[in-house]
């Protein structure tokens, strides 16, 4: 793919524009991000692409990060049927195919995230899916010993699903459970929600993750998270390395810019969306169509 180009109003020479692309790669995003940062050092510099300022503005107003709005809107003159179809393809290509849990490869699966995102309920939904739809033997483990009634909550789910639930307060207790793990296809590990500003709790999680040696990690985030908070959370959980994103509470907002922005900030793939409290019904594979429909609603 050719490198995306932008026009600076104050520039002396005109810059040619690239042909609109159907597929956007992470390389394209990084190139555009670096280019815009270089050009936009002057406070009053205005940046826009040929014929797409209005479309880019719509994406910005929706809440999408500036550089990503610029890239998604490149070459789209208006949101007519052709423009909508191109935007839909770009959003789908940017997010990529959802990457759900592979129960055939992953044994120990860890779920992390801030407080209040509905992590425990999400774990229960995935456990239910594995049991009812894939016929897997599942064990639930909770490392949440901080929240009042945390164990009772996940234990109630375990009782309903007919699966064992174990509680651990540290990684040493977790390792003592290893002999039991061999009797199950998948072990889902719930952790305490941690504020990204609570250094002590975050460091405890780092230690647990280092020695737990889990096969997959999922970062649970709420679709209602404020933009600045989202950026800080993504940065704080950077230590997790390779992980997948789960977005919860889609039923509590009509704006899903946080999903696009989180993928943009982190470079990590999405897996699931949740849109309610019902176990197991309110769980779905991440779907770019939902985000696109929200953006173009009213056009």
Each language-model region and where it sits:
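Hydrophobic positions on the alpha1 helix immediately C-terminal to the Walker A/P-loop
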Residues: 122, 126, 153
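Switch II (G3) loop of P-loop NTPases
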Residues: 112-115, 134, 138-149, 158-204
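Pre-Walker A (Motif I) flank of P-loop NTPase domains
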Residues: 105-109
């Amino acid at each position: 793919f050719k490198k995306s180009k932008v026009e600076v109003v104050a520039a002396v020479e005109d810059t040619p524009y690239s042909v609109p692309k159907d597929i956007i790669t992470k390389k394209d995003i990084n190139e555009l991000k670096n280019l815009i940062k270089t050009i936009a050092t002057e406070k009053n510099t205005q940046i826009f692409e040929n014929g797409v300022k209005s479309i880019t503005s719509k994406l910005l107003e929706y809440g999408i990060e500036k550089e990503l709005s610029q890239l998604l809107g490149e070459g789209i003159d208006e949101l007519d049927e052709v423009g909508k179809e191109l935007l839909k393809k770009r959003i789908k290509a940017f997010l990529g195919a959802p990457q759900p849990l592979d129960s055939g490869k992953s044994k120990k699966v860890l779920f992390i995230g801030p407080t209040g995102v509905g992590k425990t309920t999400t774990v229960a939904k995935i456990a239910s899916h594995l049991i009812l739809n894939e016929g897997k033997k599942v064990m639930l483990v909770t490392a949440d010993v901080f929240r009042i009634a945390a164990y009772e909550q996940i234990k109630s789910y375990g009782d309903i699903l007919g699966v064992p639930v174990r509680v651990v307060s540290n990684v040493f207790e977790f390792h003592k459970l290893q002999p039991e793990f061999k009797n199950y296809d998948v072990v889902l590990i719930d952790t305490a929600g941690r504020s990204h500003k609570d250094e002590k709790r975050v460091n405890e999680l780092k230690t647990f993750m280092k020695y737990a040696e889990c096969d997959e990690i999922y970062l649970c985030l709420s679709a209602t998270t404020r933009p600045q908070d989202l950026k800080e959370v993504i940065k704080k959980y950077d230590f997790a390395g390779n992980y997948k994103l789960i977005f919860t509470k889609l039923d509590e907002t009509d704006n899903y810019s946080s999903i696009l922005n989180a993928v943009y900030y982190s470079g990590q793939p999405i897996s699931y969306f949740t849109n309610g409290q019902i176990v197991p019904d309110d769980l779905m594979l991440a779907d770019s169509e939902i985000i696109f429909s929200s953006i173009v609603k009213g056009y």
